[in-house]
Every structure is written in structure tokens, then in C-alpha cells.
């Protein structure tokens, strides 16, 4: 079961997202700001983050920047009331993978979550195949041309 972290300061909206995602077979955990989201990421594994932009303490832009600077490639769907093109551009430049404007059609949100998770899973599978192939090449090379440190 995929686990989704929801960073949204509006409690009712956060609970709605949790309910809809749970009803669609996901495990959903909610936090109220970016700082809590980073703390949750430190203590548990998540497959995807849904984040508002305008939150207290640490906004969605900074949350995503912090994750990307730390090398975390978790898919991020930003959901916000900010509908200007510059806000959307900043969301993507910050590192988000998708962007929706409130009010949100929850059925569309579930479809986007599913698509983001599918792409992330495919990318992970490719990395595993490539990593396995590289490891196999090194093992073959070591067997055919042993190297000594002497």
C-alpha cells in the first residue's frame, strides 16, 4: 500500500484529502505545515507528498526545495489557491512534480496521485535494473581481469 504525506494547514481540507485517499486504497498521514512534513519524513517512509504552498512556519516551496537539496526525489503534488502562472512556475522550479489549483476536484487529485506514483515506481524499477546491470558488469570484469593492490 502506498503511503502519502499531506501537508495542508486547513484541517478540514487535510481531513478530506486523507479520507478520499484512504477510500481509494492509500495510507494517508496529515500534517499542518512544512516543518511537520520534514519531521515526518525523518521518522517514516512516504511514497508521495501532497503539499499546500501557503502554510505557516515553512511553506510548500521551501518544503520541496529542502527535499530536493537533500537529494530526495519523492514525487510532490502541490495543491494551492495560488492560480497565477508565476506561482505555478515557481512550484515547478522549486521541484514539485505536479500542481493543482483549489478548489480541487478530488477525483482528479486521485488520478494525478496514481499517475505520479506509477511514474515514480517505473523510475525506481529502471534504477534497479541499471544498478543490477552495472554490478553484473563489475563482477564479470573482476572475474576476467582480477586487480591486485600490490
Model-derived regions, located:
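Short, Lys/Arg-enriched segments at the junction into DNA-binding effector domains
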Residues: 3, 115-150
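Charged docking surfaces used in two-component/phosphorelay signaling
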Residues: 15-23
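Short hydrophobic/Thr-rich beta-strand motif most characteristic of the beta2 strand and flanking loop
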Residues: 25-32, 40
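Acidic catalytic/metal-coordinating carboxylates
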Residues: 33, 59-62
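Short amphipathic alpha-helix used as the core "switch/output" element in two-component signaling
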Residues: 39, 61-72
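Active-site residues of response regulator receiver
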Residues: 52, 80
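Receiver (REC) domain active-site loop signature in two-component systems and cognate sites
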Residues: 55
